[in-house]
From Swiss-Prot:
Family the entry assigns: Belongs to the class V-like SAM-binding methyltransferase superfamily. Histone-lysine methyltransferase family. Suvar4-20 subfamily.
Catalytic activity: N(6)-methyl-L-lysyl(20)-[histone H4] + S-adenosyl-L-methionine = N(6),N(6)-dimethyl-L-lysyl(20)-[histone H4] + S-adenosyl-L-homocysteine + H(+); N(6),N(6)-dimethyl-L-lysyl(20)-[histone H4] + S-adenosyl-L-methionine = N(6),N(6),N(6)-trimethyl-L-lysyl(20)-[histone H4] + S-adenosyl-L-homocysteine + H(+); L-lysyl(20)-[histone H4] + S-adenosyl-L-methionine = N(6)-methyl-L-lysyl(20)-[histone H4] + S-adenosyl-L-homocysteine + H(+)
Gene designation per UniProt: Kmt5b
EC number: 2.1.1.362, 2.1.1.361
Comp. bias (Basic and acidic residues): 36-52, 723-734
Chain residue numbers at which the record places covalent cross-link Glycyl lysine isopeptide (Lys-Gly) (interchain with G-Cter in SUMO2): K556
Protein name: Histone-lysine N-methyltransferase KMT5B
Gene disruption phenotype: Partial muscle-specific knockout mice display several signs of muscular dystrophy including necrosis and an increased number of centrally nucleated myofibers. RNAi-mediated knockdown in C2C12 muscle cells causes reduced myogenic differentiation of the cells.
Pfam family, one: SET
Organism listed in the record: Mus musculus (Mouse)
Length: 883
């Protein structure tokens, strides 16, 4: 050990509590020290002579502390006094017997007799333990001292009893005083101003019952811990042979290279453990005393450690078990032959310095990582974290509970635990705490569950807002109907598993859960919107039943071949290339002849409640008159089944027309011939983007978006052009109750690309990312609904029809104070079509105005639709102003 006062290395065989070597290593080391001591110790001195010569000696290096008087004890006296003092003070307090020198195996006699050579024989190995059976009483004495800190009173209580009279019978006044001072040294450990305490320590393999010194207050660098005292006694060759037993009590012996002698180190400081990166060092406070000095700042609760020496625990401390060796993977923690070498945390060749701040960070990281069991994800940005927290909190229950401000627009959404949507999920912030601290780049968002989150939030908002909206059974009163282009993120197309079985499997799709919820809720869909949950959708059978019940509807909604929802389960139909039959188109749009006229007349007829959006494909070769819904049918049976361009995987993936029954009650007939209703039930437009390896054919569509003011049902007419190779689906998102086909446009303000992306879902099958695709042309109540959808889409990077999205089909006519959102087109869309420029959108009633857009690109599975929206922008804005 390197002492400040000695300025030379001292070989420390010190009292490392629990850090001793195995017996053979200690024996070898002690032998080496003994031999070196024999060679260097002067032979003409005995213990008594040294004791008398240094009784009043002072060290010139550092002044003596008032708490550290020169001991003036011989090595034998120091061993006896230390054993008795620890038995009186420490053992009762700690509850076990600390290490002992056990030199009192000899008869208890004064040092005068012990110094005689004839008394060194081991003839009477009688251990003097006067305090057996008094542990509780002695512990109470220590506890009282911690309160009143009365040294004399505590000493009297500790030494009361018959044993003390016998013990001090052969002691002179000086020896009694030395013993008393030594007990005081141990008692001062429990003073409130000591700044440290002694605690049990079982870390080290060589000791079962060890102890350690822990700071109780903050110590600054170069502070002296004066009460942490070490008492030193020089050892002669005879005393070494007499007192030390290899591997038993030679744990606290140092060799001074300056004095060329072995020294016994006892006292409270003997309980300081070794560390290869210590925070303290020993400094001399007198000829035979020392204390501890802080090498760096020490925080409360941090163990006080010193450096014993380079070879104290074997050669190069190869058997050291300190915390630093554990962290660095050295010493006893170094990998052995055949074991993989642990990578050092910071102790690499070109690593960072082991500063206190870095080590504290590592320590905190380790603690937090233990606490965080399932931190599956973390957001890539702070905005993500905030938004995820909002969404997760709103997901706690599927009942009404609208989450209020989730305006942060993040590109990706952190994944939530994969549990049913109804199950409670902790907010991401909580997850982060649990999860410690996983680097952001290591966090992988789980794709499918985002749509679930999005879906449930949307349903809740719709459910709550439906109460505030005026939705009557006889006639649908729609306040401020607005078509919202919901701007979304770039969409990656991935190959989607075919078949109903894959719906639940792909990308962790929640198809089964959606079906389960549908079974519970679809019965409620027939009720008026005020009663029904927004997250319901109907099956083909229920569609027939409802249509039969609603005789007022002029349009027959024939079951779509693609309508594969039976009992809430998606059944994809094989891709037969079937197109909507003329019957269907006629039934869907009995008054389609007036559709285009209606679209033109809409701004004029608009009663400031509806917005007219006219979107036309750049190459318009065939305008679809497949706009559904006769205004007369009071039941949303007018929910035309738009023939949406469904996702057309080259293999038998479902696509085609889907009949969407509308649970909208008694819509008022549109004088223009096209009733426009802002359906709360726009179905979750999750359209499947199967990223098939086969070459895809791009289908061109003619599109027209019409808003009629009479019934408030927005209508989008999509028709396949003659030159296109795919089939078309008319999309009408008017079905309040449940429409399985929807177009949702979402705008992500954080997205770099300013292109529209729309997803069309024919409601037939759920794709791999089914939970994530919720983009549609929808009437948007809240800006908040935008965030999760866009993010869910982007995060999954997969566009697929989502059964969960259908759950949102039955949305009550809510307060659509929605603004039209532009969505960014996906350059990664399989069509490979170029991204369009800044896309507009109006309808930011009280939200951020969006940049103007010239074209709108709807990406439907493998197909895309280009809609010219620049020509209608001014009219739309004027309509909005009028509204």
């Amino acid at each position: 050990m390197k002492w400040l006062g000695d300025s030379k290395n001292m070989v420390v065989n010190g009292r490392r509590n629990g850090g001793k070597l195995s017996n053979d290593h200690q024996q070898n080391q002690s032998k080496l020290q003994q031999h070196s001591g024999k060679d260097t110790l002067k032979t003409g001195r005995n213990a008594v002579e040294r004791r008398s010569s240094r009784c009043h000696g002072n060290s010139g290096f550092e002044g003596q502390s008032r708490y550290v008087p020169s001991s003036g004890m011989s090595a034998k006296e120091l061993c006896e006094n230390d054993d008795l003092a620890t038995s009186l003070v420490l053992d009762p307090y700690l509850g076990f017997q600390t290490h002992k020198m056990n030199t009192s195996a000899f008869p208890s006699r004064s040092s005068r007799h012990i110094s005689k050579a004839d008394s060194f024989s081991h003839n009477n190995p009688v251990r003097f333990r006067p305090i057996k059976g008094r542990q509780e009483e002695l512990k109470e004495v220590i506890e009282r001292f911690k309160k009143d800190e009365h040294l004399e009173k505590a000493f009297k209580c500790l030494t009361s009893g018959e044993w003390a009279r016998h013990y001090f019978l052969n002691k002179n006044k000086m020896q009694e005083k030395l013993f008393k001072e030594h007990v005081f040294i141990y008692l001062r450990m429990f003073a409130t101003d000591s700044g440290f305490e002694i605690l049990p320590c079982n870390r080290y393999s060589s000791e079962q019952n060890g102890a350690k010194i822990v700071a109780t207050k903050e110590w600054k660098r170069n502070d002296k811990i004066e009460l942490l005292v070490g008492c030193i006694a020089e050892l002669s060759e005879i005393e070494e042979n007499m007192l030390l037993r290899h591997g038993e009590n030679d744990f606290s012996v140092m060799y001074s290279t300056r004095k060329n002698c072995a020294q016994l180190w006892l006292g409270p400081a003997a309980f300081i453990n070794h560390d290869c990166r210590p925070n303290c060092k020993f400094v001399s406070t007198g000829r035979d005393t020392a204390c501890v000095k802080a090498l760096r700042d020490i925080e409360p609760g941090e163990e006080i450690s010193c450096y014993y020496g380079d070879g104290f625990f074997g050669e190069n401390n190869e058997f050291c078990e300190c915390y630093t060796c554990e962290r660095r993977g050295t010493g006893a923690f170094k990998s052995r032959v055949g074991l993989p070498a642990p990578a050092p945390v910071i102790n690499s060749k070109y690593g960072l310095r082991e500063t206190d701040k870095r080590l504290n960070r590592l320590k905190k990281l380790g603690d937090s990582s233990k606490n965080s069991d399932s931190q599956s994800v973390s957001s890539n940005t702070d905005a993500d974290t905030t938004q995820e927290k909002d969404n997760a909190t709103s997901n706690r229950k599927s009942s009404v509970g609208v989450k209020k401000s989730s305006k942060s627009r993040a590109l990706t959404r952190p994944s939530m635990p994969r549990v049913p949507a109804a199950s409670n999920s902790t907010s991401p912030k909580l997850v982060h705490t649990n999860n410690p601290r996983v680097p952001k780049k290591l966090r992988k968002p789980a794709k499918p569950l985002l749509s679930k989150i999005r879906l449930r939030n949307h349903c809740k908002r719709l459910d709550q807002k439906s109460a505030s909206r005026k939705l009557e059974m006889g006639s649908l009163v729609l306040k401020e109907p607005k078509v919202v282009l919901y701007k979304n993120l770039p969409i990656k197309k991935e190959r989607e598993p075919e078949g109903p079985a894959h719906a639940a499997v792909g990308s962790g799709c929640l198809t089964r859960h959606a079906a389960r919820e549908h079974r519970q809720n679809h019965g409620r869909g027939a009720h008026s919107q005020g009663d029904s949950l927004p997250c319901t959708y109907t099956t083909r059978r229920s569609l027939r039943t409802r249509t039969g019940l609603k005789e007022t509807t002029d349009i027959k909604l024939e079951p779509s071949p693609l309508d594969g929802y039976k009992n809430g389960i998606l059944e994809p139909c094989p891709d037969s290339g079937q197109q909507p039959t003329p019957e269907v188109l006629e039934e869907l749009a009995p008054e389609t002849a007036h559709r285009e006229e209606a679209s033109q007349e809409c701004p004029k007829n608009d009663s400031c409640l509806s917005r007219k959006k006219f979107r036309q494909v750049k190459p318009v070769k065939h305008l679809a008159k497949t706009e559904d819904c006769s205004p007369e049918h009071s039941f949303p049976g007018k929910d035309g089944l738009p023939d949406l361009p469904g996702s057309h995987p080259d293999q038998g993936e479902p696509s085609g027309t889907v009949r969407v029954p509308v649970s909208h009650t008694d819509s008022a007939p549109s004088p223009v011939g096209c009733s426009v209703v802002a359906p709360d039930s726009f179905t979750k437009d999750s359209f499947r983007t199967a990223q098939s390896k086969k070459k895809r054919r791009v289908t061109r569509y003619d599109a027209q978006l019409i808003l009629e003011n009479s019934s408030g049902i927005p209508k989008l007419t999509l028709r396949r052009r003659h030159d296109s190779s795919s089939k078309t689906n008319d999309h009408e998102s008017d079905g309040v109750n449940s429409s399985k086909i929807s177009i949702k446009l979402s705008k992500d303000h954080d997205s770099d690309s300013n292109l529209y992306v729309a997803k069309l879902s024919n409601g037939v099958s759920a794709g791999p990312g089914s939970s994530s695709t919720k983009l549609k042309i929808q009437l948007k109540r809240d800006e908040e609904s935008r965030g999760p959808c866009a993010e869910g889409l982007h995060e999954n990077g997969v566009c697929c029809s989502d059964p969960l999205s259908l759950l949102e089909s039955q949305m009550e006519v809510d307060d659509y104070s929605q603004y039209e959102e532009d969505s960014t087109d996906e350059s990664s869309s399989s069509e490979g079509e170029e991204e369009e420029e800044d896309c507009e959108d109006d309808f930011d009633d009280d939200f951020i105005p969006l940049p103007p857009a010239k074209r709108l690109r709807l990406i439907v599975g493998k197909d895309s639709i280009d809609i010219d929206i620049s020509s209608r922008r001014r009219e739309d804005q004027s309509l909005r102003l009028n509204a």
